[in-house]
Amino acid sequence: MGQYYRCIVLKKDWKETKKPILAALSPYDFDNGAKLMEHSYVSNDYVNAFMHMVHELDTDRSGLPCVWCGDYADTFSTESLPLFKKMNTNTQKYEICGGFNAYNEAGDWMNEDGEKSDELNEVLNLIKDYNMHDYRYIINHTKKEYVKVPEYEKDKWTVHPLPILLADGNGRGGGDYHNEICINPEETNWGKRKYTKKHNAQFVGTWAYDTISVTNNEADTKGYKKIDWEDEIEF
């Protein structure tokens, strides 16, 4: 089954509040598919819109907690949204309830009575000029790291690092980022094909829920370590 993703900005106190979502976007509002590798490319509208949303909401330039959450991602406890056991009166068995799931919480934030929520419409209006901006650097304030976005190359599907770094749930559904690559694709016998782990596989999900910001100013990365992300062309 395919796994569907939503890009999400969390409130700075997201672990302590029952309403942790600051903003979220649906790929469908940008004519994109919801599977991770249907939109995780340089110059993609959905990714560009998310980066501009982060920039516009991050008014003090200290960064905001972010995640690219799939619908197969785990639900976990936070201080205000703990997991707990509840008896199912039909089965007479305890079930795990409650907890925090960013994908589900974002869905609730974006929708109101089957329509776009007022909050979502406000954000969409805030970032309506997203395609006029091209942020080149993504800074992780939690880990004191940064990554430079690869240059856009016409007619090439260059993987964008941000959705991969922020991914929660990758590897659990169709359309996810593949950690391995075939090194003898000319081999027609599938049983004889050989695979090796991609260099960028080490970064998958390592920034999920961390505090990030985006910028065009390389000077803003001073004091941060550049991660060893390799340019990767999917097609």
What spans do the regions from the language model cover?
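Short, extreme N-terminal segment that most often corresponds to the first beta-strand
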Residues: 1-29
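Low-complexity intrinsically disordered segments
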Residues: 35-235
